[in-house]
């Protein structure tokens, strides 16, 4: 009995020593950091009463400009580099990219196939896969998909009008409507299927899309473990995505492939590219589903939230809304009343509005990278980064830094005029990342967002109402930025306002 007690005491002492030593890592190196608590490190309250930005942004604000190019924090027991210097961020993403190719995110192609997509995979797989998928996102392919997205935009206009006519005082929850629009767009462009989400909120494709982002397979502590120690989680064959969601997307891809191959259907879309890769033996059905899923994931929640945030800000500032609407109307007049791919390129103020929306609400509010080798930050050996160490670039904190964007809480599209852009470092705006691993679907996302805004603003006026939150609160359980309480706006048809 005494031997057992002695062993337990020794184990506790060793554990205490290990935790204390681990949590003194940054202090021993002379790097600024906040005190950590076992077992969550600096992640206390994460996904409960704090969003990730609520944890990271104060650390960025406290330690930026203190002489070191980064601060330290802990994801559970894992010490993570928090980049506070924009020149270092640029070096990580662009100049020294070869050392920071990997994102260090959880992926498990064997047991959790939908996680094996381009955004998550690391090592030798990601570069050839990106090169093969890049042709889908060229300007020529965007021009080809433009009419399809516009068709969904027209349906969005019809559905929005019907909902506004039937709603009490014309008040609509915009976020869900935007999600149904983006799910229909991506269903057609990525999966080659008609989703009918706009007409039917209970359409399976739209429901599965919402579930893929909102439902957690595990409790917060287990999720935190998977995200903090992805290699260990992969070794333990842990999974993040519910099986029925995986089965749904794999099933859609399998059925689409079978139909196209049997009927000889060839389209210039994303699914056709995946089929060609499968026929060359480069992808399995499960791997195809993972790539189609990330097309969906990257365009569904991100573009839907961006549309909602943009309409929210335009509703709060009617003068900006009127200015953007006038630009849209002028572009239509110059093109005989038609909205074309060329006329979309002429919407300069639209570009400013979208850029400022993504500045204030970067949907992915942080970027992660892994250092492959020992690295001296900015050439200073004192500020070294160890091999295998995770780095985090706090996009939200950078975008809300008053030294870069005075009065960052205000929505000012003119921040992105050429003369103001020239005054800021290139790493001051990172909604799509930067460098060789920037967002591959950036063009598609911008096009989808632009068409959505054009479809709505040429037909409707948006204004705040008693249910509009004065400030958007973010859903704490989501690593992305999305509204916790929806976005309620009053929607009026322009034709009825002028009559």
Curated annotation (Swiss-Prot):
Principal location: endoplasmic reticulum
Entry's EC annotation: 1.14.-.-
Binding locations of heme: 439
GO molecular function, one term: oxidoreductase activity, acting on paired donors, with incorporation or reduction of molecular oxygen
Cofactor(s) the protein needs: heme
Keywords tagged on the record: Endoplasmic reticulum, Heme, Iron, Membrane, Metal-binding, Microsome, Monooxygenase, Oxidoreductase
Membrane association type: Peripheral membrane protein
Pfam families reported for this sequence: p450
Keyword match Transcription regulation: no
Top EC class of this enzyme: oxidoreductase
Function field: May be involved in the metabolism of insect hormones and in the breakdown of synthetic insecticides.
Family: Belongs to the cytochrome P450 family.
Protein name stated in the entry: Cytochrome P450 6a22
Species classification: Eukaryota, Metazoa, Ecdysozoa, Arthropoda, Hexapoda
Gene: Cyp6a22
């Amino acid at each position: 009995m005494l031997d057992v007690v002695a062993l337990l005491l020794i184990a506790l002492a060793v554990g205490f020593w290990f935790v204390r030593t681990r949590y003194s890592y940054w202090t021993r190196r002379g790097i600024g950091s906040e005190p950590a608590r076992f077992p969550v490190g600096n992640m206390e309250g994460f996904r409960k009463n704090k969003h990730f930005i609520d944890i990271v942004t104060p650390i960025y604000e406290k330690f930026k400009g203190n002489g070191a190019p980064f601060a330290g924090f802990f994801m559970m027991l894992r010490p993570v580099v928090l980049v506070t210097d924009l020149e270092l961020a640029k070096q990580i993403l662009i100049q020294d990219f070869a050392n920071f190719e990997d994102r260090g995110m959880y992926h498990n192609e064997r047991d959790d196939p939908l996680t094996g997509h381009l955004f998550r995979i690391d090592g030798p797989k990601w570069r050839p896969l990106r090169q093969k998928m890049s042709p889908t996102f060229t300007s020529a392919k965007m021009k080809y998909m433009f009419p399809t997205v516009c068709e969904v935009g027209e349906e969005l206009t019809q559905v929005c009008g019907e909902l506004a006519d039937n709603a009490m005082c014309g008040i609509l929850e915009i976020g869900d409507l935007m999600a149904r629009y983006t799910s229909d767009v991506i269903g057609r462009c990525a999966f080659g299927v008609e989703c009918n989400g706009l007409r039917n909120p209970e359409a399976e494709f739209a429901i599965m899309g919402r579930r893929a982002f909102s439902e957690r397979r595990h409790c917060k502590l287990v999720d935190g473990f998977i995200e903090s120690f992805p290699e260990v989680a992969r070794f333990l064959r842990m999974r993040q995505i519910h099986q029925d969601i995986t089965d749904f997307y794999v099933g859609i891809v399998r059925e689409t492939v079978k139909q196209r191959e049997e009927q000889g259907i060839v389209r210039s879309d994303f699914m056709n590219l995946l089929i060609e890769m499968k026929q060359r033996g480069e992808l399995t059905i499960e791997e195809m589903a993972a790539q189609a899923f990330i097309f969906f994931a990257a365009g569904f929640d991100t573009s839907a939230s961006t549309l909602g945030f943009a309409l929210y800000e335009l509703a709060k500032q009617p003068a900006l809304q009127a200015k953007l609407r006038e630009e849209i109307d002028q572009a239509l007049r110059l093109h005989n009343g038609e909205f074309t791919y060329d006329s979309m390129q002429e919407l300069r103020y639209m570009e400013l509005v979208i850029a400022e929306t993504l500045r204030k609400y970067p949907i992915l509010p942080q970027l992660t990278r892994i250092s492959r080798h020992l690295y001296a930050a900015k050439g200073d050996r004192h500020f070294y980064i160890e091999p295998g160490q995770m780095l985090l670039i706090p996009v939200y904190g950078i975008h809300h830094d008053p030294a870069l964007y005075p009065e960052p809480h205000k929505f000012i599209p003119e921040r992105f005029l050429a003369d103001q852009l020239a005054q800021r470092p290139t790493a001051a705006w990172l909604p799509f990342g930067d460098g060789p691993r920037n967002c591959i679907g950036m063009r598609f996302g911008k096009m989808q967002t632009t068409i959505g805004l054009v479809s709505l603003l040429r037909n409707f006026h948006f204004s705040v109402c008693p249910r509009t939150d004065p400030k958007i609160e973010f859903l704490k359980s989501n690593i992305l930025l999305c509204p916790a309480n929806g976005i309620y706006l009053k929607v009026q048809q322009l034709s009825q306002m002028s009559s």
